[in-house]
Structures are given as C-alpha cells and as structure tokens.
C-alpha cells in the first residue's frame, strides 16, 4: 500500500488533520487541500492516485472539482465524501466519473478499503493502457502496397 498516494480535499481542517494522522498510522501517503482550487493546484505538482473529495465546500464545490479533475487527470480515481443531506450529489458524482462515495463520518478502515479498491482499479487500467501502447501494428505478409500513381 505504500505506493498509493491519497489527496484529502475538505474545507473542515479538523477533519483533514485527524484523517491524515489516522491514514499515516496505516502507512498511507496523504496530502491535503482545503478547497477545490487548492486541490487542482497541488495535483499539478503531486502524483496522486486517489482523491477523497468532500461534496459540500464553499467556492468550488466537490462536483465542480470532480469535473475538473476528470478533465485534466482522467486516471485519478475520485471518491466522493458526503453527508446525509448530499447523497444526491454523491450519486451525481458517480455519474460524472467518481469511483465511489463515503458517508460522513466515515470509518477509517472503510475509507482505506475504498481507497485501496480505487487504487487497484487504477493499476488495472494503467496496465491495460501500457499493454495497448506496447502493441505494434503488424501488416499481413500478403498485403501488397498499392501503386497510387496511375
């Protein structure tokens, strides 16, 4: 699991600090952002595999942040973090490309489990891309080049 790097995005700094400490104890590499725009700026510099993203934030909310992440970094897996009142937003997030969602407050083991599943999904996709890119187009030995000058 030490390969996986998570970004937590939430405007509640106490939640970020507590969750970051709990994840660090489990050996997870974590960075934090307190807004969607801060998250996007950090993603420019950081190689993040999974983003755990709060739906309800002032300014750029979770849905707008999700759209921007998926547009710029389609391989990053995003897990929406939501309260009971914003389950509809989590469903909207799933429709827009989020991998999963978690209800607040969430159990740290459930959070880690969902992050590991998302990371595994990304690794499979990266492998498929690598295999596809390594294939070379082979021409049939029976293929005869056409003379286009007639």
Name each model-derived stretch:
Residues 13-31:
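Two-component/phosphorelay signaling modules centered on CheY-like receiver
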Residues 32-41, 62:
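Helix N-cap/capping motif at the beta->alpha junctions
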Residues 41, 63-75:
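Short amphipathic alpha-helix used as the core "switch/output" element in two-component signaling
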Residues 57:
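Receiver (REC) domain active-site loop signature in two-component systems and cognate sites
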Residues 106-119:
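C-terminal output helix
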Residues 121-150:
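CheY-like receiver
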């Amino acid at each position: 699991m030490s390969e996986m790097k998570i970004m937590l995005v939430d405007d509640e700094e106490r939640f970020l600090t507590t969750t970051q400490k709990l994840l660090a104890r489990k050996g997870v590499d974590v960075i934090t952002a307190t807004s969607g725009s801060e998250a996007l700026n950090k993603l420019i510099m950081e190689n993040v595999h999974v983003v755990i993203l709060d739906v309800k934030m002032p300014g750029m909310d979770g849905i707008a942040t999700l759209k921007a992440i998926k547009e710029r970094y389609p391989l990053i897996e995003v897990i929406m973090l939501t309260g009971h009142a914003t389950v509809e937003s989590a469903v909207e997030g799933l429709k827009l490309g989020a991998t999963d969602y978690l209800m607040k407050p969430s159990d740290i083991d459930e959070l880690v489990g969902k992050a590991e599943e998302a990371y595994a999904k990304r690794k499979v996709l990266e492998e498929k891309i690598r295999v596809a890119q390594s294939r070379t187009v082979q021409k049939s030995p029976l293929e005869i080049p056409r003379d286009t000058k007639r």
